Amino acid sequence: MLIIIRPSGEIALKSPRSRRNFEHTLANNIRSVIKEGKIWRSQGVLFLEVNDDNKNIEELSKVFGIASFSPVMSIKSYNNNLEDIINKAKEVFAEIVKGKIFSVRAKRIGSHNFTSLDVQRKVGEALYPFSRGVNLENPEVEVFIEIRNDVAYFYHKIIKGPKGLPVGVAGKTVVLFSGGIDSPVATWMMMKRGSIPVILNFNLGGSVHRKFVLEELSVLRKWSGGHKLKLFIVNGTDVLIKLSQIEKRNRVVMLKRVMYKVAERLCDKANVKSITTGESLSQVSSQTMTNLYVTEYGIKYPIFRPLIGFDKEEIVELARKIGTYEYSIKLPEYCAISTKARTSVELDEVLKDEENLNIDYEKVLENSEVIEI
């Protein structure tokens, strides 16, 4: 089976050098995911030759950087022979348009002694006897012919990809991953922008928490373009014991600040240049403008919050699409360690608590469990 793969539109807008780099990364990611066949680049698209397997279709639909793709049949059209194209179109499309209202879409790259309109008209005439009629505006079925120099490609399906950028072109980011609904979606969105996530989980729920986090990451791994996901699991119970020393209403913000501090150390250790969270503005008390300011105060790495403007319904909808929702919904809200958390914590108060707690963030990270998925 031959598949034509169309990269995301924004890749075509890059400089020639960046475009080559992005397309090269996309090709490598496809190789890692499909694990078979032959792939090559040609005039703004990629071609993939694989065994006839529907599994490949499903896997390609989760590779970021792909706008769409189509299984195709092809012929060499020597000497600009339009008759060859018409005959092949009848062979490929006669059954597809049978008893249906159809349209023909054609486009060309290269020099030919006929136009795209000629192809549409002549192929349409040849297929008309098999059909129920032609309607260019609202057909029941569309058939496509793409002529690239001396090769013509025939297809009738355009399968959508997830678009975005190939995973790996934007470096790495440390993701604070609770395993709730939000953090897997934030991870997915950063992968969509070409980033490889390094996962940091504070385990506050023992083996159950660990189990569901691993299941969620197994789902996200299918979207990673073949890149392995590295997971650091920190024993959050020890941190909670420390936090019991401070005022109860400040504990949620302080817990988040501890997570940021450990994430900062992980960035140092893994040579990562950013931190990502699943926070959404004003969704909960720790995510008010004031508390976000306090939480990230003094952190030296940029903090990305891809869900900052999303409401919960939008996040849930994405989680269902990704496939993580069925696991996230089973997890308790482990980070909700106070029922009366403040919506506006004073920075000076938090910094004083931080000094008194004297948490060794390096040691917290050193004692983490590391898993590669």
Curated annotation (Swiss-Prot):
Catalytic activity reported: [ThiI sulfur-carrier protein]-S-sulfanyl-L-cysteine + a uridine in tRNA + 2 reduced [2Fe-2S]-[ferredoxin] + ATP + H(+) = [ThiI sulfur-carrier protein]-L-cysteine + a 4-thiouridine in tRNA + 2 oxidized [2Fe-2S]-[ferredoxin] + AMP + diphosphate; [ThiS sulfur-carrier protein]-C-terminal Gly-Gly-AMP + S-sulfanyl-L-cysteinyl-[cysteine desulfurase] + AH2 = [ThiS sulfur-carrier protein]-C-terminal-Gly-aminoethanethioate + L-cysteinyl-[cysteine desulfurase] + A + AMP + 2 H(+)
Localization: Cytoplasm
PROSITE patterns: THUMP
Gene Ontology cellular component terms for the protein in this record: cytosol
Keyword Acetylation: no
Gene Ontology MF terms in the entry: ATP binding; CCA tRNA nucleotidyltransferase activity; tRNA binding; tRNA-uracil-4 sulfurtransferase activity
SMART domains: THUMP (SM00981)
List of residues binding ATP: 176-177, 201-202, 256, 278, 287
EC number per UniProt: 2.8.1.4
Pathway: Cofactor biosynthesis; thiamine diphosphate biosynthesis
Keyword tRNA-binding: yes
GO biological process, one term: tRNA 4-thiouridine biosynthesis
Superkingdom as given in the UniProt entry: Archaea
InterPro entries, alphabetized: Rossmann-like_a/b/a_fold, ThiI_AANH, ThiI_fer, ThiI_N, THUMP_dom, THUMP_ThiI, tRNA_STrfase, tRNA_sulfurtransferase_ThiI
Keywords for the protein's UniProt record, in alphabetical order: ATP-binding, Cytoplasm, Nucleotide-binding, RNA-binding, Thiamine biosynthesis, Transferase, tRNA-binding
Annotated THUMP domain residues: 54-158
Function: Catalyzes the ATP-dependent transfer of a sulfur to tRNA to produce 4-thiouridine in position 8 of tRNAs, which functions as a near-UV photosensor. Also catalyzes the transfer of sulfur to the sulfur carrier protein ThiS, forming ThiS-thiocarboxylate. This is a step in the synthesis of thiazole, in the thiamine biosynthesis pathway. The sulfur is donated as persulfide by IscS.
Entry similarity comment: Belongs to the ThiI family.
Record's protein name: Probable tRNA sulfurtransferase
Organism this protein belongs to: Saccharolobus islandicus (strain M.16.27)
